[in-house]
């Protein structure tokens, strides 16, 4: 049983805050950096409600500078400045504002062509990573991974309800092509 009082701190597949979630996320980012350094296509896609954790943001900036393409779909608080030369040129941030607040968190790591998907409850905020019980699980079913690909691709292609974050921290409506 996973609760705030649980003694178990290691899990086989489950990434759990405050125990393993932060460290594993940072390992996954570092792995994408290694793939980029080896000349492989490297990409991270994150769909979440908030990203404000300093260590996570610094890791994503390092990844961007190493050649990793990063697409973020962030519903709420976002402390990343995308598109800043020499800092975050490969990071794109969009927000999709619809009728309903979305609660799904989806992570995707290209992993040298063997894409990995994760779903869970955690936003990338220090309170979620360090002071709450949150869980993220790898998606091991191929069909479920394909469905997540479809969902994220649709969200990244949305031109009706999406806004893009610019380097000057302003949001602009995505232009309909």
Label each residue range with its predicted role.
Residues 1-3, 13:
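Metal-dependent catalytic core segments for phosphate chemistry
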């Amino acid at each position: 049983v996973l609760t705030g009082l649980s003694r178990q701190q290691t899990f086989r597949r489950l990434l759990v805050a405050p125990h393993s979630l932060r460290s594993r996320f940072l390992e996954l980012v570092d792995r994408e950096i290694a793939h980029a350094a080896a000349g492989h296509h490297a990409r991270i896609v994150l769909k979440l409600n908030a990203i404000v954790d300093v260590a996570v943001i610094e890791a994503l900036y390092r990844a961007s500078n190493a050649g990793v393409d990063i697409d973020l779909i962030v519903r709420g608080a976002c402390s990343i400045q995308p598109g800043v030369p020499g800092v975050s040129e490969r990071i794109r941030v969009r927000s999709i504002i619809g009728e309903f607040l979305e609660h799904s968190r989806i992570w995707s790591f290209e992993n040298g062509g063997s894409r990995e998907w994760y779903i869970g409850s955690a936003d990338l905020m220090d309170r979620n990573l360090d002071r709450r019980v949150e869980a993220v699980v790898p998606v091991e079913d191929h069909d479920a991974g394909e469905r997540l690909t479809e969902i994220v691709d649709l969200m990244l292609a949305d031109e009706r309800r999406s806004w893009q974050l610019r380097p000057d921290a302003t949001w602009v409506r995505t232009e309909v092509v």
